[in-house]
């Protein structure tokens, strides 16, 4: 039987963004760990390095490493869980691993690992640096679609839904807009890059003009904070668009917000979310013509729209719940049996 575990969670909690990213996946994972009864201590690495500037310590890397060492010595964790921690070097991780041999090391990594996608070499390098030292690794892409990971220590996790954050039930009411679309050029940047274009813009430009849209991140800036949820809450349907070519199971973390708040969600079939959801819970499409046809079908059948959105909402809250995902991370890391098994856990 698994006892309560002391976990040092080193991940960006976005304090410097003043609430703009209060619904981040890192926060949802953290909430799940606490709700599961674990003793969790946080280091928000990018906030630490942002607050302490020193011309003799570029990027405040030495300062961050010393903070981590002090926290380990005082807290004595059973497990260290890393998020996107990019200010530590190979030698830093090597020292941690050699110095604290009894501590389990794990990482979660949510960015795309798509060869024909954005920042592939950079993201691969960021992931692999920690991968070398971690007992377990958790990614939002199917390990079977990536050729440089060991499937015995690398596992898929979906983007988490947190019922304390994803509180809306859009499937129960009528809305001002038909379709919600939100994209960005990076959550840390927050605003659009000038003259930037990618596959998502091409898809948006080819969408049917017979429905009304609530779109952010194309001609206007992305929407963040509570405004994101207020705009989402004006819509009955949403299209989940991620950068790069489709790869098995990968999605931006908006997928959790769309399903988790009761929108009828469209996603390309090459992401294989039909492995998790039936056609009565989510809508997959083959190409832009198929997508446009299905958008019009559900716009003209509100009863069916709400039924599928409701089913998707219930299923997503059941299988993508942050408590479930956080429990999976801990159990896999310590080699405990996973009790509640769902379709995504087989990857």
Tell me the role of every PLM-derived stretch.
Residues 2-55, 67, 75, 84-91, ...:
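Nucleotide-sugar donor-binding catalytic core of glycosyltransferases
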Residues 61-62:
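N-terminal accessory alpha/beta regions
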Residues 72, 76-78:
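Proline-aspartate-enriched helix->loop->beta-strand connector
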Residues 83-84, 97-105:
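Short, conserved structural micro-motifs that define repeat-unit consensus positions
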Residues 93-100, 208:
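Surface-exposed amphipathic alpha-helices with a cationic face
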Residues 106-120:
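A short, histidine- and acid-enriched strand-loop-helix "catalytic/donor-clamping" loop
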Residues 282-289, 298-302:
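Conserved acidic donor-binding segment of nucleotide-sugar-dependent glycosyltransferases
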Residues 294-298, 302-347:
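C-terminal amphipathic helix plus adjacent low-complexity
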């Amino acid at each position: 039987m698994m006892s309560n575990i002391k976990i040092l969670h080193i991940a960006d909690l976005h304090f410097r963004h003043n609430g703009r990213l209060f619904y981040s996946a890192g926060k949802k994972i953290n909430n799940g760990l606490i709700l599961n009864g674990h003793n969790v201590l946080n280091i928000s690495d990018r906030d630490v390095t942002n607050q302490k500037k020193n011309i003799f310590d570029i990027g405040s890397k030495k300062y961050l490493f010393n903070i981590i060492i002090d926290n380990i010595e005082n807290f004595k964790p059973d497990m260290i869980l890393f998020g996107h921690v990019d200010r530590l070097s190979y030698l830093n991780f090597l020292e941690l691993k050699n110095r604290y041999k009894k501590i389990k090391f794990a990482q979660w990594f949510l960015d795309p690992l798509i060869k024909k996608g954005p920042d592939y070499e950079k993201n691969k390098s960021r992931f692999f640096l920690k991968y070398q030292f971690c007992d377990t690794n958790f990614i939002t892409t199917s390990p079977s679609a990536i050729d440089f990971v060991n499937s015995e220590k690398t596992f898929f996790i979906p983007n988490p839904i947190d019922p304390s954050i994803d509180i809306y039930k859009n499937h129960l009411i009528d809305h001002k807009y038909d379709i919600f679309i939100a994209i960005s050029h990076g959550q840390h940047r927050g605003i659009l890059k000038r003259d930037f274009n990618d596959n998502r813009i091409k898809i948006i430009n080819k969408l049917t003009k017979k429905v009304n849209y609530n779109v952010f991140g194309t001609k206007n800036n992305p929407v963040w904070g509570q405004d994101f949820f207020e705009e989402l809450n004006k819509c009955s349907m949403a299209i989940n668009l991620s950068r790069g070519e489709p790869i098995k199971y990968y999605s931006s973390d908006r997928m959790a917000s769309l399903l988790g708040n009761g929108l009828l969600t469209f996603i390309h079939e090459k992401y294989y979310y039909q492995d998790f959801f039936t056609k009565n819970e989510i809508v997959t499409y083959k190409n832009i013509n198929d997508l446009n046809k299905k958008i019009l079908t559900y716009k003209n059948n509100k009863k069916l729209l709400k039924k599928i959105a409701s089913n998707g909402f219930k299923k997503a809250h059941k299988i993508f719940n942050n408590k479930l995902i956080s429990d999976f991370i801990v159990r896999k890391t310590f080699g405990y049996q996973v009790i509640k098994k769902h379709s995504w856990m087989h990857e």
